[in-house]
């Protein structure tokens, strides 16, 4: 995770130092514009050498929770402005403990498995949607939908579909390997992956025009792999869903039964790739299959098998980013990557503007973020069409006084509005200047 984040920050031209005790791991980054330092992240000497006394952010994402927390505490004491630690103790996420950790010098805690489980359950709640992103508890919603021949709005110019009074905007289209930030002359085609921005009450309408009404709502779920992500997902699925976890390790099955004893989750000892086992466990009457083993290839193949057996909704955890493209080409469905989910959470701490809910969308090499417009910021001075936004940046909607609304060229953004920004191949540091107080043109 640290390596992925360091590469991301290097790409964004952030000065970055990566600390690791493993010299071989550091040598793998020789081709990147990243300064590496061999040493312990809990060594004051090493932290000083890395520049912790003047750093904007220290990120502790080793597999060792205690080491991450200690590194953050030490870096804060040395003068680092913000710190974030990766944890695996769910207790630490309790809201009442936030001031406690803040007093220790730890600004933010991330539990990647919890973040991934949230994405998984968002996908399970809407079987026809591959990605969902909510602003202000769903006042504004972005939906990523794979379009098929049943879609009513194919092969029509968007200017005929997405007028000022229409209940949705299309902020991006993925067509093959190409990402399109659409204009009025662009059209949607069969097999496109489209991102719709809408408000909560119009989600059923989007489902209808996309031709997805025949998708059965998810009631029965099979999860393959009984790791931490599976546990967090099973603990947070809606009560109306029946969840089965298939785990190959017998001792882990015993542990899962202990962890999930207060839920209705059924734990099954077996290989989730075994077709006879899947048939025995009712895969023909299962609406969603979630593959969460630690092996990307296994997860992809398992989802392909589930699809052949009639499961419409499949979700695969793909930690190896090299396999994400292949998973998309194979039409796996929803792809979960803990590295990008956690990196998005961390990256927003580097932005000076008031930004939250930042997400990286692997499928379209883009970011989507919720910015709050500051008093006197550039984005509040003119209608959207006159702002001179960078190419690849789209404002999809905003939330004002708790009410979601779409944005068009004539819209005027007010101070305090929460604004959804879709940003393709753009440095978010360039985007945030529009939302900061006393922004300069």
Feature map (PLM): residue ranges:
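Cytosolic regulatory regions of ion transport systems
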Residues: 1-441
């Amino acid at each position: 995770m640290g390596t992925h984040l360091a590469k991301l920050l290097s790409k964004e031209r952030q000065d970055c130092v990566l600390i690791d005790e493993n010299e071989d791991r550091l040598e793998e980054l020789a081709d990147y514009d990243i300064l590496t330092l061999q040493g312990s992240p809990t060594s004051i000497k090493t932290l000083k050498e890395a520049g912790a006394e003047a750093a904007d952010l220290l990120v502790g994402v080793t597999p060792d929770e205690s080491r991450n927390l200690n590194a953050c505490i030490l870096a804060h004491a040395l003068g680092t402005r913000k710190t974030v630690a990766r944890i695996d103790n769910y207790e630490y996420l309790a809201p009442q403990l936030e001031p406690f950790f803040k007093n220790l010098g730890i600004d933010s805690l991330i539990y990647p498995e919890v973040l991934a489980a949230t994405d998984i359950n968002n996908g399970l709640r809407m079987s026809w949607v591959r990605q969902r992103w909510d602003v202000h508890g769903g006042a504004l919603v972005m939906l990523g939908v794979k379009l098929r021949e049943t879609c009513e709005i194919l092969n029509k110019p968007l200017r005929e579909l997405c007028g000022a009074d229409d209940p949705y905007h299309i902020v991006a289209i993925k067509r093959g390997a190409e990402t399109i930030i659409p204009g009025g002359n662009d059209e949607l085609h069969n097999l496109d992956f489209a991102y719709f921005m809408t408000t909560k009450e119009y989600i059923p309408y989007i489902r209808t025009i996309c031709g997805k009404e025949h998708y059965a709502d998810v009631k029965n779920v099979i999860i393959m792999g009984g790791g931490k992500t599976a546990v967090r997902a099973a603990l947070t699925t809606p009560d109306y869903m029946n969840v089965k976890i298939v785990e190959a390790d017998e001792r882990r099955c015993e542990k899962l039964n202990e962890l999930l004893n207060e839920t209705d989750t059924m734990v099954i000892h077996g290989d989730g790739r075994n077709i006879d086992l899947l048939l025995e466990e009712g895969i023909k009457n299962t609406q969603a299959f979630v593959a969460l083993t630690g092996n990307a290839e296994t997860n992809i193949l398992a989802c392909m098998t589930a699809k052949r057996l009639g499961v419409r909704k499949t979700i695969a955890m793909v930690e190896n980013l090299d396999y994400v493209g292949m998973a998309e080409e194979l039409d796996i469905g929803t792809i979960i990557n803990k590295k990008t989910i956690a990196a998005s959470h961390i990256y927003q701490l580097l932005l000076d503007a008031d930004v939250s809910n930042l997400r990286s969308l692997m499928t379209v090499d883009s970011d989507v973020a919720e910015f709050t417009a500051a008093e006197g910021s550039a984005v509040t001075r003119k209608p959207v069409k006159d702002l001179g936004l960078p190419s690849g940046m789209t404002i999809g909607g905003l939330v004002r006084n708790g009410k979601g609304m779409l944005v068009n060229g004539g819209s005027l953004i007010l101070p305090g509005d929460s604004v959804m920004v879709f940003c393709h191949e753009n440095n978010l540091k360039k985007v945030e200047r529009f939302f900061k107080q006393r922004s300069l043109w």
